[in-house]
Curated annotation (Swiss-Prot):
GO terms for molecular function: 4 iron, 4 sulfur cluster binding; CoB--CoM heterodisulfide reductase activity; metal ion binding. One of its GO terms (cellular component) is plasma membrane. Belongs to the HdrC family. The lineage of its organism: Archaea, Methanobacteriati, Methanobacteriota, Stenosarchaea group, Methanomicrobia. Keywords: 4Fe-4S, Cytoplasm, Iron, Iron-sulfur, Metal-binding, Methanogenesis, Oxidoreductase, Repeat. This is Ferredoxin:CoB-CoM heterodisulfide reductase subunit C. Pathway: Cofactor metabolism; coenzyme M-coenzyme B heterodisulfide reduction; coenzyme B and coenzyme M from coenzyme M-coenzyme B heterodisulfide: step 1/1. InterPro entries: 4Fe4S_Fe-S-bd, 4Fe4S_Fe_S_CS, CoB/CoM_hetero-S_Rdtase_csu, HdrC_iron-sulfur_subunit, Helical_ferredxn. [4Fe-4S] cluster 2 binds at C29, C62, C65, C68.
Length: 161
């Protein structure tokens, strides 16, 4: 196992050797019933240091409901480990296109859903302020958010690699 991957998993409290591959996590997973998410396989791939574990789209299918973690007979924090693997994946440049697009929107306008003229008009018709109480309404707050995102290097993480 690569030193970096092992460090990430240890930080999540995941003792990869304690997993007995019983399948309780996968069998309990609500998302796994409808998608390609197989938590047991992801843990196994991480344990075997398979290069594909970070680029696997299934890593992003977890909804973080924590069912797998609650039911694991060994008490392995599986969801936390998946989140750590996601963080490492992003640092290594593996980000789903739709996540990258949302990141770009947040960097650009401070919100994942930009406010267009049609939405402003509909809000006015409903008797609402055309611009809701978000950073989009306050230019100085938007600039502060952009500065904060730059300081924490979010722009670099979101950039295409």
């Amino acid at each position: 196992m690569s030193e970096e991957l092992l460090k990430v998993l240890k930080a999540a409290g995941l003792d990869v050797l304690s997993c007995m591959h019983c399948g309780t996590c996968t069998g309990s997973c609500p998302s796994g019933r409808h998608t390609g998410l197989n938590t047991r396989r992801i843990i196994r791939d991480a344990r075997k240091n398979r290069a594909t574990v970070l680029s696997d789209d299934a890593l992003w299918l977890c909804t973080t409901c924590y069912t797998c973690q609650e039911r694991c007979p060994r008490g392995i924090p599986i969801t936390d480990a998946l989140l750590e693997l996601r963080r490492l994946a992003v640092r290594k440049g593996f980000m789903r296109p739709e996540h990258r697009r949302v990141s770009e929107l947040v960097l650009e306008c401070g919100h994942a859903v930009p406010l267009d003229e049609e939405t402003k008009k509909k809000r006015e018709e409903l008797g609402l302020d055309p611009i809701p109480e978000t950073v989009q309404k306050y230019p100085e707050a938007l600039e502060e958010l952009k500065a904060l995102l730059k300081t924490c290097k979010f722009d670099e993480l979101a950039a295409e690699k």
